[in-house]
Amino acid sequence: MDSFLKKVYIFSLIFILPVLINADNEVCFELEDNPYPNHPAFGVFSKYVNVLDCIEIYAESNISDEKILHIAAVAAELLDNDEDGNVDDPLIESSLIELNTVMPVFQSENGNAIETFFDNLDEDGCTGAVVFRNEIDPDQPGHWGDDATVEEVLHTINSCGHVEVYPALYALEPNASYLTDAMDVARGGQFITFPGTYPEDSWYHYDDWTCDYECMAMEYLYWCIVTNMDILSDAQTCAGIANEWEPCSPELFEATDTLMFNLVTDPANQLPQLAPDGNYCPSSADVKKKISPISFTVFPNYPNPFNPTTTLQYDLPEDG
């Protein structure tokens, strides 16, 4: 190859490579303006995405479009894990729609927007979690310590979907479900609050004093689902989470926590098996544009590795 052709070839690689990389991040959702700019709570947001009619994402103006669409893609992948354009579990879909499920995206936990939002959120609905700008990394979907999107979206779907639809499996109270019975085994006993130290044979030992029993159960469900997806098995992550969660690979999960492995992998339960990669654009997808009536209830905001001590508690009247 002569020098001219070499230069052309190298130039072509340099030019084409970014296009190929960008082409890998495909999200077939439309970013819109906030449909309720004058609402006392939702007026703090300027950006909006409707995800399969199930989750409505509201974001502050300084959150990049890329990050908002990343949340939308991850949410869609968790709801439609086979990416055929349809939510995998119709009952979960119905619950999320009926409860007007919302995911707020804030610049920071210290800003005025989050206080204004919750102070004025005065009607029924479902907010299972929030996410902050610095917790979102579209380049590392679900990677512990870098991208909390998978965790916070799972908390939202589980809180507003699974706990509501399948209480025998997922109710969060002590002695109430398969989930909490399994958690009592994983923690080495039934501890309503953090016991200070856990039995030596436990493998789930969450140590956040602000997290009550129900919060512990929600975190446990998250760990089980993402472990089965093989999101946590790299050496750095395993070491980083060992103080809280020991079986960091699917193989260890199967061998250690047989109760939850059986629940998570049972096809009848229709839990997501594949880790989101931040791409969602099924050829058969019908991306809907329904805007639900504003009506919300705040569910517990479960901690994440970025803000492990964040606690949001609001007393909201049932009717504004």
PLM regions and their residue ranges:
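Bacterial Sec-dependent N-terminal signal peptides
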Residues: M1-D24
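A general structural signal for short secondary-structure junctions and capping/turn motifs
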Residues: D2-F4, Y48, I92-I97, C211-C215
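Low-complexity, Pro/Thr/Ser/Gly/Ala-rich linker/spacer regions in secreted
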Residues: N22-E26, G278-I294
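N-terminal low-complexity, Pro/Thr/Ser-rich intrinsically disordered segments
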Residues: D24-V49
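Acidic/His-rich structured neighborhood in mature extracellular/periplasmic domains
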Residues: F42, L52-P195
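Post-HExxH zinc-binding segment in Zn-dependent metallohydrolases
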Residues: G161-T237, E244
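Pan-zinc metallopeptidase signature
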Residues: E214, L221-S284
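Glycine-centered coil/turn sites that cap beta-strands in beta-rich domains
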Residues: K288-Y302, F306-G320
